[in-house]
Amino acid sequence: MAAEDTPEWEDDAQPAARSSDSSGPHLWLVPTPVGNLGDITYRAVEVLRDADAVACEDTRRTGALLQRLGLRRPLVRLDAHTMYRAPQVLEQYPRLAYVSDAGTPGISDPGAELLREALSRDIPAEVLPGATAFVPALVLSGLPTARFTFEGFLPRSGRERRERLGTIAARPEPTALYESPHRLHATLLDLAEACTPARPASVSRELSKRYEETRRGTLAELAEYFAQGVRGEIVVVVGGRTEAEAEDTAPDWDSVTAELAVQGLSTRDLRSALMQRGLSKNDAYALALKHRADR
């Protein structure tokens, strides 16, 4: 590495010390390990140690983590059901650290709502770098990673789930998503139907733990492999749509739109129907307007 390319790191203790020396209100979003306690950072420990209190989704889980780290701080439950208490908690504990059950807060958890509340009150906020599950899973998938989309958790059922599956199927870049063990098999089957059974994908579970596993294959192969169930936290990565796949499966959208338009659908319903079939939002809207105008 050339001298001019050398990273300009600050001293390990400086970022935490800079914030901790301030006496004013402050919110820290602190990543916690997704499985291996050794993944906690020095800075995360310092912030947890110096905060007035630690807000979290599960006080028992976070209490066990703090005990392992040798820390004793007041714990406040702030999850999806108790986030209405955020204004009160921010006032009671001006220097507040927030952790999720695992990984980086603010992604697929209530931390984002707490952050918005703090920002609305002009409270300075920091997000510490640290552990997350979908980035290691994305890299381990072996799929191209220059561009990707993170979906979080899919809707469990209904039109919104179908629309999201159609959007995933149409993307040229890989998609990473979280799934629970008891829904994994059904989701893999739905993805195989939406994306074609031959679409490459991977399933990673128990990342950073003793029984970590990443299984790669087609969606059909993965659905068969995990048909008997699985345990652990799961990340699914689905490969992007290839040009050849797009050419083989691309429908005649004008014909599809014309068939739907004769049913008397409104422009909004027509657009929604096209999106359910995998067309992008902008293209669906343009076709819906065109066919409504032709009638």
Please provide the spans of the model-predicted regions.
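General beta-strand structural signal in soluble alpha/beta enzymes
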Residues: 56, 127-130, 177, 203
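Conserved helicase motor
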Residues: 76-84, 154-158
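Glycine-rich, flexible N-terminal cofactor/catalytic loop recognition
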Residues: 2-81
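A contiguous loop/helix-start segment that scaffolds small-molecule binding in enzyme catalytic cores
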Residues: 2-17, 24, 95, 174, ...
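Generic beta-sheet signal
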Residues: 26-30, 92-100, 148, 173-177, ...
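Class I SAM-dependent methyltransferase SAM-binding "motif I" and its flanking Rossmann-like core
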Residues: 113-171
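Short active-site oxyanion
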Residues: 48-54, 122-126, 174-175
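Short amphipathic alpha-helix with an adjacent loop that forms part of the alpha/beta core around
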Residues: 16, 85-92, 167, 226-227
